[in-house]
């Protein structure tokens, strides 16, 4: 399945390293990040999982819940045994304390429902997919990285900031925007309505390019 922005995130029941979950129930009214990694006990994936664990507070203050899925597990172990043993390595080598769930998907049902397996890359392992999902259970962002390239989680946090801001206010965020910087007033807002909606002030660069200080700080 090729999920697109605005599609409903497929729901699923799954076993994880912290017990069984229903994905939509777990999300509740929060934002969620669902990621896939190619395989346990691999170098790039190990650094990624450690990085996410060390950014726990940054995700938490954005009410961003994290779930990680893997279909590549260690031979001789069940998927959950593989995940659990690998977490020990992640904690040891990355100075981390992984406490978010890793999902087992032995039949690749979840991976296929999210389009995480790209046959031109590998027909058995997932690519490095990222799905940001809103409280309405709709997909807000989709990114796919090749197996050779680790993800930039600072960028993922930046996108969550932008998505949460623009879900509440009639603004967009410009190139390289970071939390605390000026935003763009969306074209749907008439210029004469800007002072009432954005009392912090605004700047008219062009009639189609109006900026305002970030409204929620």
Language-model regions: role of each:
Residues 1-217:
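Chalcogenol-based redox active-site neighborhoods
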């Amino acid at each position: 399945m090729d999920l697109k922005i605005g599609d409903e995130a497929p729901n699923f029941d799954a076993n994880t390293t912290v017990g069984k979950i229903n994905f939509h129930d777990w999300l509740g009214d929060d934002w969620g990040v669902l990621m896939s990694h190619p395989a346990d006990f691999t170098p790039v994936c190990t650094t990624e999982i450690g990085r996410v664990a060390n950014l726990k507070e940054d995700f938490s203050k954005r009410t961003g819940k994290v779930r990680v899925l893997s279909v590549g597990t260690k031979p001789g172990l069940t998927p959950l045994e593989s995940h659990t043993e690998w977490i020990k390595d992640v904690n040891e080598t990355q100075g981390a304390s992984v406490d978010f769930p890793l999902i087992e998907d032995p039949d690749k049902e979840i991976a296929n429902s999210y389009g995480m397996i790209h046959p031109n890359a590998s027909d058995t392992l997932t690519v490095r997919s990222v799905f940001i999902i809103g409280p309405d259970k709709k997909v807000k962002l989709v990114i796919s990285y090749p197996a050779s390239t680790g993800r930039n989680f600072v960028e993922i946090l930046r996108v969550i900031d932008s998505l949460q801001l623009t879900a509440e206010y009639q603004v967009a965020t410009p190139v390289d925007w970071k939390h605390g910087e000026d935003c763009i007033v969306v074209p749907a807002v008439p210029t004469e309505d800007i002072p009432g909606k954005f009392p912090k002030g605004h700047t008219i660069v062009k009639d189609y390019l109006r900026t305002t200080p970030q409204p929620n700080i």
